[in-house]
């Protein structure tokens, strides 16, 4: 299924080719296991809570919105990148002051990112 999702994303068509329409039709009734996303969301939010970050936890996405520690979300994202954290500034979505944090990674990546989130927070204290 990942290969299908990856190929469709890379194509970027509004009207998918017939082949992809047939593949999706064959897969549409397949069960989705979202438990890994829920576990990762819990792991990330627990870590952010311990560090005192403010965020909005989603009900069904694979990312959350975290309040940037300065009004300029792009500058905050650039500072995070120095800590090897890749955050998407909300300016791209028409709102400032927030960043999007994805948790569609392994649990180890989330665990290993917490020291960087802690260091980033210290940069603003």
Model-derived segments and spans:
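PLP-dependent class I/II
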Residues: 1-125
